[in-house]
Amino acid sequence: MLLQLLQADLAAGLLAFSFGGTHGGATVSSVGPTAPVGHNGAMALIVQKYGGTSVADAERLRAVAEHIAFTHRQGNQLIVVVSAMGKETDHLIALANEVSRTQPGRELDMLLTAGERKSMALLCMALADLGIEAVSLTGSQAGIITDTTHGKARILEVKGDRIRDALAAGTVCVVAGFQGVSTAKEITTLGRGGSDTTAVALAAALGADTCEIYTDVTGVFSADPRIVPTARKLHRVSFEEMLEMASAGGRVLALRSVEFARNHNVPLHVRSSFTWEPGTWVTSEEPGMEDPVISGVTHDISEAKVTVTNVPDRPGISAALFEPLADANVIVDMIVQNTSKDGTTDISFTVPKADMSTAERIVAEVAKEIGAGGVDHDDNIAKVSLVGAGMKTSPGIAAKMFRVLADEDVNIEMISTSTIRISCVVAASDMQRAVRALHTAFGLDSGSMYSAPLPERR
């Protein structure tokens, strides 16, 4: 059934984008039954990434295999990156917690990478059943070289020799996302969202014509449709806007994958695994186009606030506080320092809740060393943000945002800005009300309820 849906949509002439091998300007063409054309008239090299919901069970794996088979039969070279099936990673983490309170990073990475190896092997079996020659490769086998940080490794290099050889032989390469091998020859994981980063890194290293990110939504929306049912789908978003959305809590794309795509100018197409309508293109900003003032409202409930009170106000104190956090790979987001009074000040900042125990331990030690008054934390917060490339040339956005929140009786605890984003920390209990009010106030409601039912599967 899914194959018929895809063929029908293609025959109807859905729009696709063809990009040059250097990821240059995009041209729009009507897609028919012929193969998409890559750079220099050759067959296209496409990287497709399928998330956990897309490969959650045997039925969905077979559906993904049909999609891959159809795309491959159109003459395309394909690299497919897969996540672990469904909640497999969460299950493995829970299992580790049952077994041990102390989990060495090396062993945890060895455990967690098993999820992607399972899904890649099963997908290759499903492809073989359709007559498609495919080979599964772990991150190590695919040549993804990382630093030595377990759990949050960063990609240093993609060799990709085995992938090139397989593609030259007409084979579909199915690569395990989320993982690589360190310079010390140890298995590493890239952290949450690492499969997105794997896909973009492969696309950049191998000169892919495009990178398709398949997920459980039909694209990037102006807000989370679960909170704002009238959120509208964005047909195009710039790398800069997507970076701000991802850093402000948008869950469609992982932040590091967008950074990689922007740095290497890899065009991304975010679309649903369950419907065949066009999704959202994430590309470099097009000259001559007037940007919308506000593209979206995002929220993030994954952070906690730490406040260090009565900090001595003298040079070097901030460095003494934040350098140990950086050394421990704790990402600090928003930072606010109060005006000095009586030679002391308060410093508040936000960190991921997942890093809270590490941050608390480090900050408590530093607070004693520098003679601060104490350390407080609050994990019942949410970050609500406005994002829009047109914001930098439109005055009054911050004032309007603050007025809307005030009218909703939402108290603002912290504020941070960039040229195209304004973020406010509010109480977690106020988050949904704040998002809905801002979405309406800035004219983002589509007027129709979001609905994306799964297609019938046979």
Question: Language-model features: where?
Answer:
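A conserved regulatory-domain signal marking ACT and ACT-like small-molecule sensing domains
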Residues: 278-458
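Terminal amphipathic helices with adjacent charged low-complexity linkers/tails
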Residues: 82-89, 270-286, 349
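Acidic-aromatic/histidine active-site loop/patch
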Residues: 261
